[in-house]
Structure formats: C-alpha cells, structure tokens
Amino acid sequence: MVAELTALRDQIDEVDKALLNLLAKRLELVAEVGEVKSRFGLPIYVPEREASMLASRRAEAEALGVPPDLIEDVLRRVMRESYSSENDKGFKTLCPALRPVVIVGGGGQMGRLFEKMLTLSGYQVRILEQHDWDRAADIVADAGMVIVSVPIHVTEQVIGKLPPLPKDCILVDLASVKNGPLQAMLVAHDGPVLGLHPMFGPDSGSLAKQVVVWCDGRKPEAYQWFLEQIQVWGARLHRISAVEHDQNMAFIQALRHFATFAYGLHLAEENVQLEQLLALSSPIYRLELAMVGRLFAQDPQLYADIIMSSERNLALIKRYYKRFGEAIELLEQGDKQAFIDSFRKVEHWFGDYAQRFQSESRVLLRQANDNRH
C-alpha cells in the first residue's frame, strides 16, 4: 500500500513540476504582452478580455470534468501576478510634453506609489517634503502638475501654503475627504484642479482593478490625459461630486473604521486570548478578526483623521450607536419575533444583493480557509 501511494505521489509531483513550467511560460508571455501594451498605451486591465477568457476556460474545464470554479480560482491568482509583473515593463507616456511633476509629501507611502507609477510612465518627478519648504518656490516654478499627498489633517493647510504655480499647472490632491481640499485648491490656484481618492492602500502592488474616485475642480480638458494615464495603469475611474463623495465615505470609511476600532478596543479590554479565538474560529470569524487586526497594524493618525474629518461622521456614528441600543433592547426583552421581523426588513432592503454577497463571500471564505495552517 505504501509503495502504491508513493508511486502516485511521485506522479503528482511530476504533474506539479509540469504546471510550474507552464506557469513560467505563461509569465514569459505576459512579459511580452506588457511590452506591447507599454508601447501602444494600452491599459493593463481590460474587463471584457478577462471576462471572455474566464468564461471560455470555465466551459473548457467543465468539458474535461474539471470543476469550473477551480480553474477560475487558479487563473484569477495567476492574473493577479500577471498584472503585477506587467508594471515592471513601464507604461506609455500619454503626455510627453508635460513639465516635471511635483509630489508634495512624496516620501509617504501613497506619494511613493504615485512617484513609481509616474516614473514608470516616463515623467520626471520631484519630491517636496517638509524640510524642502524653503525651496518650494523653486521646486514648483516650472511644474506641469503638483500632487498633494499629505495627511488629511494638514491637507488644506499645505494647499494654502503652496507658492504660486504656473497658470497651466494641474493641481491635484489625494486626500480621503474631498470637499474641503477641493475648495482649498480652487482658492489657491487659478489653473486646472482635480481631486483624486485612490480607494486602495499603497501596498496593493498593482493598480489593476483598483478604483480611483475623481472630482472635477476646474478645466477638466487640461487633466483628461492624466485620467487616461491612470486607466492605462489598470485602474477603474469613478466620477462623483466632492459633496457626494464625502457623504458616501462616511459609510465606507468613517463608520466602518470606527466600528472596527470599537470592536478591537472591546477585545483588548476583555483581554481575550487571541490564540484560542483563532484556534476555535470559523473561516468567517477568522477573516473578520484579520480585518480588525489589520486596522491596528496601521497609522492611528490616518484613522483618527478619517473618522473625525467632519461633524457628519460623528452624527452618523451616533445614529449607529442609537440603533445598536435599540437592537440590544430586543435582546433584553427576549423578543425573538421582533428580532426576526427586523431581520426580514433588512433582508428585503438588501434585495438581490444578499444572495450576491453570499456567493462572493463564499469564495473569500474558501480562500481564507485554504490559508489556514
């Protein structure tokens, strides 16, 4: 029996080696694709191509008796690696005549990411940090674009301190709140103004499939090329007004981050044994705990800035607190029917999204379980 099992395992090892060789060949082809895309200014991520390819592979897998979900899982992981490696080939310069780009706060993580992407795209990039401020006027004197990438709590102050910029210079900010910084830029500069909010962390590795929100400030025709450049990097653009942006971010960022903070604080105050929680946890709780722990591995100043960026955020969090209390009252009253009625009400509000999110989360939970040791 042992000899038979060993022989089968040896065959599996040989198949795995063949898979490795095929993956290496695929990455070589991806590198060639990256060179072609760079030369012609084509975006890294093309949704239609990816969807078509996955649909074809799923059908072919089913015909071979291979679970379609398996090949999709494998290919999605391979494609993520492919998108990352395509970065190394650089990108076409969509605005060759652009004068130097100055990134204010370019030493920070997001600033460094934009410096990398702009440099890979053939633009000259300068960094303006706090210790360079006495030379700021010289550094921005011939700038074609100035990107402000500083902590939220000093963004408007830094914008207000900028020396006069060339009239055709594009002024951009990357803050997580948009209305205040956008208004500050419109006051500080008479030329083109653009508000950006990258909806991802600087450790993403690739901009493929990442969302970049943009808010028009002034003269969109002057910065249209930059939006197209960001699309070439693989990102998806979403336009919204600065006011609507901040209203949505109250839910997406402020409330979510605060709830995560409060849960982490509760765990710490209860002094639970994390090792035991992890050993006993289901995949969904492990994933939730990972998201909580991830928050506390990052800069507390950033999250304080996001959560406390407006009175609107505080009002929303207070409403959440009130509803939390109302839900606790159901428990205190032991009113299961009222709980079920509330549950059904929310279920109805989610509509088809409930089933969609269940399917999406099922994939995430399988991946989380795969990573368990």
Residue ranges of predicted features:
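Adenosine-cofactor binding site in Rossmann-like domains, unifying the SAM/SAH pocket
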Residues: 125-138
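Interdomain hinge/lid region at the active-site interface
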Residues: 278-353
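Rossmann-fold dinucleotide-binding core
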Residues: 178-181, 185-236, 240, 249
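Hydrophobic/small residue at the entry helix of a nucleotide-binding pocket
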Residues: 109-110
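Extended, charge-rich alpha-helical interface modules
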Residues: 1-102, 116
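Rossmann-fold NAD(P) dinucleotide-binding segment
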Residues: 137-185
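Active-site-proximal catalytic alpha-helix in oxidoreductases
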Residues: 210, 224, 245-271, 278-297
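Hydrophobic Val/Ile/Leu positions in short beta-strands of Rossmann-like dinucleotide-binding domains
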Residues: 103-104, 148, 214
